[in-house]
Each structure stands twice: as C-alpha cells, then as structure tokens.
Swiss-Prot record:
Residues 246-297 form a coiled coil. Keywords: Coiled coil. SMART domains: MATH. PROSITE patterns: MATH (PS50144). This is MATH domain and coiled-coil domain-containing protein At3g58220. The keyword RNA-binding does not apply. PANTHER family: TRAF-LIKE SUPERFAMILY PROTEIN. CDD domains: MATH. The lineage of its organism: Eukaryota, Viridiplantae, Streptophyta, Embryophyta, Tracheophyta. It comes from the Eukaryota. Residues 10-136 form the MATH domain.
Length: 313
C-alpha cells in the first residue's frame, strides 16, 4: 500500500494514494512537506471521518505540538481530487482567510468527495490510485519560529514574528490591504462592535478580527454552496467572537437568516425533485393515454368501414 507525495511548486503538493479501494476506515497520512516555511501533512479517511459515502480530507500543521504558545498561520487553501478524464472537472474545495492555530491545527472537509465518484468511469480512480493536490498560500505567520538549517522552521524564543505580507493598522487591528475596505465598513457601521473587546495583544486582536471577517465572507456565499460543516463552523466562529467581547447581535441575526434560507433552499430542492419525478410520471401517463387513444381511434375507423361486394361474393 504505497502513498507517494511530491512537491509541485512553491505552494503546491501532490499526494498519490495507491490501492485506494483496499484501504480501511483508519486515517492515512501523507509525507510531511514545507510550504511558506511551515511543515504540513495531509490526512485522508478513505471510508469517511464519522460519515458514510464520502472520503474525508484534511491538511494539518505537522509540528503543531512543538510550536510555541500563541502561534497562528493565516492561509488560503485549495484542495483538489484530480480527475484524469480531460473532459470532466476535478473535485475542488477552496477556502480563503483560513487560520491555523493551537485550537485548530488542522482543517478540511468530511465530505471531500463521494465514494460513488471514486468508482466506475468518473476519472478520479485510475489503476487503483487517487491523486490529491493541495495548494496553500501562506500570508502571515505569528509566533516565535526559527528556521533550521534545512529551511524548515522550528520553535525558538529568540526569533521574531514573520510577516509574509504587509498589514495595515485599522483602529488597532492589523489587517491585509485586501481587508481594509471591509474592516473599515464594519467599524463605521457598527462603531460599538469592539467596546467590550479587551485584548491588548495585537496578534490576538488580529486573529479575532480575521475570524469575524471569515464568518462574514462565509455568510455572503449562496446558501446552495454552504455545507452543513460550513454552518457548524459559522456557529463556532460566532461564539468565538462573542466570547472575545465583540458586540455582534447584528451578525447573529444574519446567521439565523442564512440558516432559514438554507432550510428553504434544501426543502425547495427536495420538493423540486419530487415535482420533477411526478411530472415525469405524469408525462409518461399522457404518452400512454395518447397511444391508447390512437388504438381506439383505429378500432372505431375499422368499425365504421362499410362492407363491400367482395365481402359477400
């Protein structure tokens, strides 16, 4: 049972899982790899992580247990199960402004891909192999982390925090240039939002603001695109920012609104499928009735035909 991993570029890693169909319910791990100066590894559950009919896939900070207290990594993540059929799309999951830290050293999807797609002629399973490609853009690393001789970072209280991309100060919050407009709008519309937020540590302040931004970006997605996992994470994010001291009653209302829309979307989708099935059956009945009608017309025409002399002599 081989599992081969190899770097594709500065921020990409490829993992080939061999003999996929023979793997059991236990988690399997890729080799460790380095992106953005941080060590990572992939974790796959071929039979699903407490969920049936799916393969689950996660990315994890490999040496998280050995990192110093308070570390965090801001990333953009794309995970892909490669489809080798050129005419069919690969299965992709994407998340921006994603934070890894002590509480969340790993992140991924329980429902990465259905088992039904990993069989037959879908193109994802070829010669018993499944290929995973992960792309990680590392924007900021907070924590006292030092490079080893091999270029890999390790914890060391001497070194300073790495800033991969410059940030801007908005009312005491360090944010990326791409986040300035959104954060400014939030603080302008809700000036009391941070009155109860007492954290002085700038890294903690920034981490909390990024959780808030991620939550808003999640709720801006179409309900159709939001999975049950996304909604659970939204609940957790809301509790996190509330516990931190943010006044976000307005965001709580928006979350409930999105949940209601999600229920309507799911219920409506199910009802549409039911109606389509009923309509299909109705159309078939109409076709059957039309065929029966033509037969009856033919019988009537035959019955109306007059007898000729040939019928007698």
């Amino acid at each position: 049972m081989g599992r081969i991993g190899s770097p594709l570029g500065k921020n990409e890693f490829s993992w080939v899982i061999k003999d996929f169909s023979s793997l059991g319910v236990r988690a399997i791990y890729s080799d460790e790899f380095v992106i953005g100066g941080c060590k990572w590894r992939l974790i796959a559950y071929p039979m699903g992580n407490r969920i049936k009919k799916y393969m689950s896939l996660y990315v994890e900070v490999a040496d998280s247990k050995h990192l110093p207290s308070g570390w965090s990594i801001n990333t953009e993540l794309r995970m892909e199960v490669v489809n080798h059929n050129l005419y069919k799309p690969s299965q992709q999951k994407y998340r921006k402004n994603l934070w890894f830290d002590q509480k969340t050293p790993s992140w991924g999807y329980k429902t990465m891909i259905r088992h039904s797609k990993l069989s037959g002629e879908e193109g994802f399973l070829v010669s018993g192999e499944v290929t995973i490609v992960v792309k990680i853009d590392v924007y900021r690393v907070f924590g006292k982390i030092k490079r080893n001789d091999d270029g890999v970072k390790s914890n060391d209280s001497v070194n300073k925090t790495q800033q991969v991309k410059e940030t801007m100060d908005i009312n005491g919050f360090q944010v990326l240039p791409s986040q300035v407009t959104l954060v400014s709008r939030i603080l302008k519309k809700y000036p009391d939002i941070a009155l109860g937020f007492n954290a002085k540590n700038r890294h903690l302040r920034t981490a909390c603001m990024n959780v808030l931004i991620s939550l808003i970006e999640t709720l801006c997605q179409s309900p159709q695109e939001l999975s049950d996992e996304d909604m659970d994470e939204a609940d957790n994010a809301l509790v996190y920012v509330q516990d931190a001291g943010f006044k976000v009653d307005w965001l709580d209302k928006k979350l409930k609104e999105v949940k209601e829309k999600k229920v309507v979307e799911q219920t409506g989708k199910t009802r549409i499928q039911e109606l389509e099935e009923e309509l299909k059956e109705f159309k078939q009945k109409c076709l059957d009735r039309e065929a029966l009608l033509e037969k009856e017309k033919a019988k009537v025409l035959a019955a109306r035909a007059s007898l000729t002399l040939d019928d007698f002599v």
